[in-house]
Amino acid sequence: MKLNKMFLVGALLSLGFASCSKEGNGPDPDNAAKSYMSMTLSMPMGSARAGDGQDQANPDYHYVGEWAGKDKIEKVSIYMVPQGGPGLVESAEDLDFGTYYENPTIDPATHNAILKPKKGIKVNSAVGKTVKVYVVLNDIAGKAKALLANVNAADFDAKFKEIIELSTQAQALGTVADGPNPATAAGKIAKKNGTTDETIMMTCLQPSDALTIEAAVSEANAIAGIKNQAKVTVERSVARAMVSTKAQSYEIKATTQIGEIAAGSVLATITDIRWVVAQGERRQYLSKKRGTVPENTWVTPGSGFVPTSSTFHTNATEYYDYAGLWEDHNTNEAVISGTQVPTLADYQLQDVTGELANALSGKFLLPNTHKSGANAASSDYKRGNTAYVLVRAKFTPKKEAFIDRGKTYSDNTAVPEYVAGEDFFVGENGQFYVSMKSVTDPKVGGVAGMKAHKYVKGKVLYYAWLNPSTTSPDSWWNSPVVRNNIYHIHIKSIKKLGFNWNPLVPDPDPSNPENPNNPDPNPDEPGTPVPTDPENPLPDQDTFMSVEVTVLPWKVHSYEVDL
């Protein structure tokens, strides 16, 4: 597919790893060590067919290839866990990566990044014992260290799979008071270091094979792998969403007669296309956790939550993070908030500004999975529990689209002319109006008692699921988001008018449209319909946007969507 080749070429322009070497190597075990050990780290460019297709070398859905990324590994924490019962876990935490490891190399056979040791790790209490070695890289939030402190060997494996909370429920619901870029849950363990590289937390899926730590092994022999060398594979703890667009603007054509505009003629233009991501989880298992049914290979803390219209508002924040909706937020309603969506051509540029680099590099989120199914009844993926990309744009209809244009109200006052960039209303009959007054006045083309959607300053919204299970919008029942995967969404067209507000944000008082946690709230006009329901399944019965998604490992998934 031409798109995938172009995207991967652009992504691979930034291929590379970086190491960080600083003064001081972190905590160093007792200088009178009884032996040395070392550890070789392998980083696959993805995760691991099962019922939901996520446990394979080429995971469903829309898998197209791999992307090495540009990881900066700063710290390494190693845990030597004796096997066979209770005992002391010997650890070496926050070791400086640049001191202990060579720069990564790529294995041509497996395409894994291999991190070979250049300094041995002193061992004391683990000498003479058979251990398994667990690893955490870049514990930048200190969550792993806190979880694993003073854990007995017999309990360590279970503890390594427990939940870490990255954002509280309050932090997961941003407000305008938090500023334009509140910290997301994923942002606590994955950070972009300008345009150069990224520091992302990583953990091992499995510990090393059992290894007996022999006494009196020299540092040189441990480094060479002659004795006392463990091998562990690690993967990134977050997923990444990336969005691109075929064009920076689109023309929308009428499908029926709208005002004076005939079906098939240009109705409006779409410009200023921006995006944010939400409903990744706010917590995660420290190490990726396998599910008990094939329909959900990798479970997340919220895998069992299936919302109703009411429980979404009362319980969704127990599981999900919505702070990302406030990214690049502007308090001026006339300005479209969010990150500008780049074109595929932008990925080919050699000279990239900081702003464009931010757009090209995507956004991090925590994994979010549920039980998959072949229809609405069997799938647990619903609109209120599935990670989504929210696309915002400016919709400017032609003046001829307004059915009330040039007419006089029942009170003999003139209907004002529509001004581009101002509010407009779309009635349940599909016609455009300049005000709610026009919507209900039959004399100007309205209908008494008719409801309408208010579009504040022309802002429109579209949803895209990160990893839909089919290429057809009317049958994509599932959308698993798994760590160490990149989900690339390519907008190839925008076909219709989108939504006017976002109901997929928990509201502490659903009866009050003024939700302080929602940057795209209900405009609170009399009779404003709810665009979508959190308990609805994912498929669109009416397709607004055409999207192609590609999933990059990292595993890359990509698909196109028509909005």
From Swiss-Prot:
Residues 504-543 are annotated as: Disordered. It is found in: Fimbrium; Cell outer membrane. One of its GO terms (cellular component) is pilus shaft. InterPro entries: Mfa1_C, Mfa1_fim. A lipid is attached at residue 20 (S-diacylglycerol cysteine). The record marks 49-50 as: Cleavage. Residues 20-49 form a propeptide. Pfam families: Fimbrillin_C (PF15495). GO terms for biological process: cell-cell adhesion. It comes from the Bacteria. Disruption phenotype: Mfa1-deficient cells show increased autoaggregation. Double mutants lacking both FimA and Mfa1 lack major and minor fimbriae; they fail to adhere to host cells. Residues 1-19 form the signal peptide. Keywords: Cell outer membrane, Fimbrium, Lipoprotein, Membrane, Palmitate, Signal, Virulence. NCBIfam families: fim_Mfa1_fam (NF038041). Belongs to the bacteroidetes fimbrillin superfamily. The name (minor fimbrium subunit) does not indicate the abundance of the protein, but is derived from the greater length of the major fimbriae. In strain ATCC 33277 and strain ATCC BAA-1703 / FDC 381, major fimbriae are 300 - 1600 nM in length and about 5 nm in diameter. In contrast, minor fimbriae are only about 80 - 120 nm long. This length difference is observed only in a small number of strains, including strain ATCC 33277 and strain ATCC BAA-1703 / FDC 381, and is due to a loss of function mutation in FimB, a protein that restricts fimbrial length in other strains. Structural component of the fimbrial stalk. Minor fimbriae are composed of a structural subunit, most often Mfa1, and the accessory subunits Mfa3, Mfa4 and Mfa5. Mfa1 interacts with Mfa2; this anchors the fimbrium in the membrane. Fimbrium assembly occurs by linear, head-to-tail oligomerization of fimbrial subunits. This is mediated via insertion of a C-terminal beta-strand from one subunit into a groove in the N-terminal domain of the following subunit. Interacts with S.gordonii ssp5. Structural subunit of the minor fimbriae. These filamentous pili are attached to the cell surface; they mediate biofilm formation, adhesion onto host cells and onto other bacteria that are part of the oral microbiome. They play an important role in invasion of periodontal tissues and are recognized as major virulence factors. Mfa1 orthologs from different strains have highly divergent sequences, and this correlates with pathogenicity. This is Minor fimbrium subunit Mfa1. It comes from Porphyromonas gingivalis (strain ATCC 33277 / DSM 20709 / CIP 103683 / JCM 12257 / NCTC 11834 / 2561). The lineage of its organism: Bacteria, Pseudomonadati, Bacteroidota, Bacteroidia, Bacteroidales. The gene is mfa1.
